[in-house]
């Protein structure tokens, strides 16, 4: 057992070191870039060391615990700890954020502020995944809003202010319900508010109150995940944001909603989750079909990829709603798989858009001839997104399928119907992705247009793409490497769930 404050260092280091960026000399962007990369690499190395040598995979309980009193007035503690549910998300955050800072090298306007905001997001995300106090969880949840809003509103397309405003309105609206739920759980049945997750797990509520709390939290998570019909901010945001910001949004921010749904709704409110789970499965199945169909009608290829993210989130919702070991592990695997694939697709879309200055599919064609490397990687990650066997997307969706089929919660006919709907969604996915590839890369429309910007990927971009492609293939070939992180904790969570 380690008493060293590893998690506090991981939470504080990025934002503290990031604040020193403003004191660096204003001689170009090179110093700021390398400094930010160094901070991200140092954070990731500390993270990897701490988890390799101080985290026991076979122990399903909370590890690396830290508990310090922060505010005496209402018993607010700085409580941190991790388990198998949060370990994968923290490693994903470190990996994607490090590569997103590398992707952001072309940013030259206000680069110091840009990199500081990325590091501030980094701290908030690590803090959220390692929080063991519900109020601290809420604070870290809200810490994301300001950096993301500024990243969206200051760097992006022509309608970036509109998309940033839409994002802040949606997420702030959901946060109101989150705060009401936090206060309701903290004040119920006690004269002194207590928000320790360990205590709240053993807290029981009247059925009506538990349903109201569950619904309030669900609205907040439905915005971030997103769940239809609270998803409309996502295509606008991804259509306008800089591609390094899109990597953080698709790779990590959406996963915060899924993590909250498991950590709070499923773990703390089991009775309500049991009642809501059929509706979650139905919503997830509808979301897969709806988002895939809508994606097919998008002219903007960035928005087409954004709707594909909404569709893939449907598998996570179904896995969480299945209430089985297999289904929940599949949902966690899909969280990690889509974190890699979604972030890379937006990076590729952004780099292609920077070169072509075009985003509408009918204006494109023949890009594979001047840019064969971008074409190869775009095709490879599109195959991963449509769940090609041997890649992480296939394993994650297959495990969710098995989780739903083996669920004792549902009868045979509903399971067959939901499985049929999911299968239709999986058929629609290659249709909209392959049609996008055909319109962008095949033909001769842009091949004869002289353009000095039509250059292929450089070493920096290829290094980034290969770094993400390796875990996508690795998880597809040997998924037990990732499943071993969460399987014991999921078993404990569901055993407690059924006993309640």
UniProtKB/Swiss-Prot annotation:
Family designation: Belongs to the complex I subunit 4 family.
Keywords associated with the record: Chloroplast, Membrane, NAD, NADP, Plastid, Plastoquinone, Quinone, Thylakoid, Translocase, Transmembrane, Transmembrane helix
NCBIfam families for this protein: NDH_I_M
Subcellular location: Plastid, Chloroplast thylakoid membrane
Key word Transmembrane helix present: yes
One BP term from GO: electron transport coupled proton transport
Disulfide bonds: none
A family per Pfam: Proton_antipo_M
GO cellular component terms, A-Z: chloroplast thylakoid membrane
GO molecular function annotation: NADH dehydrogenase (ubiquinone) activity; ubiquinone binding
Catalytic activity: a plastoquinone + NADH + (n+1) H(+)(in) = a plastoquinol + NAD(+) + n H(+)(out); a plastoquinone + NADPH + (n+1) H(+)(in) = a plastoquinol + NADP(+) + n H(+)(out)
Membrane topology: Multi-pass membrane protein
Organism: Saccharum officinarum
InterPro entries: NADH_Q_OxRdtase_chain4, NADH_Q_OxRdtase_chainM/4, NADH_UbQ_OxRdtase, ND/Mrp_TM
Name of the featured protein: NAD(P)H-quinone oxidoreductase chain 4, chloroplastic
Ranges annotated as spanning the membrane: 4-24, 35-55, 87-107, 111-131, 134-154, 167-187, 211-231, 242-262, 272-292, 313-333, 334-354, 386-406, 417-437, 462-482
Annotated EC: 7.1.1.-
Signal sequence interval, chain numbering: none
């Amino acid at each position: 057992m380690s008493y060293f404050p590893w998690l506090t260092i991981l939470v504080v280091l990025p934002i503290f070191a990031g604040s020193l960026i403003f004191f660096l000399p204003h001689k170009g962007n090179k110093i700021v870039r390398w400094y930010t990369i160094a901070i991200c690499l140092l954070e990731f190395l500390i993270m990897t060391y701490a988890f390799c040598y101080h985290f026991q995979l076979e122990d399903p309980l909370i590890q690396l615990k830290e508990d310090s009193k922060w505010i005496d007035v209402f018993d607010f503690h700085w409580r941190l700890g991790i388990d198998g549910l949060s370990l994968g998300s923290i490693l994903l955050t470190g990996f994607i954020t490090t590569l997103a800072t590398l992707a952001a090298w072309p940013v030259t306007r206000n680069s110091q502020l840009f990199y500081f905001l990325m590091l501030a997001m980094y701290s908030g995300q690590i803090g959220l995944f390692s929080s063991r106090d519900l109020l601290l969880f809420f604070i870290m949840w809200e810490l994301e809003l300001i950096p993301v809003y500024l990243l969206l509103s200051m760097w992006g397309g022509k309608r970036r202010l509109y998309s940033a405003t839409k994002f802040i309105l949606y997420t702030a609206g959901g946060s109101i319900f989150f705060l009401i739920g936090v206060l309701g759980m903290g004040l119920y049945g006690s004269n002194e508010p207590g928000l320790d997750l360990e205590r709240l797990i053993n807290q029981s509520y009247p059925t009506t109150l538990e349903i109201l709390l569950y619904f309030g939290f669900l609205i907040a998570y439905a915005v971030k995940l997103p769940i239809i019909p609270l998803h409309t901010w996502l295509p606008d945001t991804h259509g306008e944001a800089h591609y390094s910001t899109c990597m953080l949004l698709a790779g990590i921010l959406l996963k915060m909603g899924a993590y909250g749904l498991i950590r709070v709704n499923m773990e703390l409110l089991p009775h309500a989750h049991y009642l809501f789970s059929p509706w979650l499965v139905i919503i997830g199945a509808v979301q897969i079909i709806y988002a895939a169909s809508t994606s097919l009608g998008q002219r903007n290829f960035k928005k087409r990829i954004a709707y594909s993210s909404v569709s893939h989130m449907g598998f996570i919702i179904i896995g969480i709603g299945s209430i089985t070991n297999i289904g929940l592990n599949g949902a966690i695997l899909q969280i990690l798989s889509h974190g890699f694939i979604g972030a890379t697709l937006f990076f590729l879309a952004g780099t292609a858009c920077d070169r072509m200055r075009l985003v509408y599919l009918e204006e494109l064609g023949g890009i594979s001839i001047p840019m064969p490397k971008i074409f190869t990687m775009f095709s490879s990650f599109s195959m991963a997104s449509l769940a090609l066997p041997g890649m992480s997307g296939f394993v994650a969706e297959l495990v969710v399928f098995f989780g739903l089929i083996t669920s004792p919660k549902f009868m045979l006919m509903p399971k067959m119907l939901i499985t049929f709907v999911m299968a239709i969604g999986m058929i629609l996915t290659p249709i909209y992705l392959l049609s996008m590839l055909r319109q962008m890369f095949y033909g001769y429309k842009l091949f004869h247009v002289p353009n000095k910007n039509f250059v292929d990927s450089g070493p920096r971009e290829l290094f980034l793409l290969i770094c993400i492609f390796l875990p996508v293939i690795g998880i597809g070939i040997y998924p037990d490497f990732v499943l071993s992180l969460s399987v014991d904790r999921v078993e404990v969570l569901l055993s407690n769930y059924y006993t309640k």
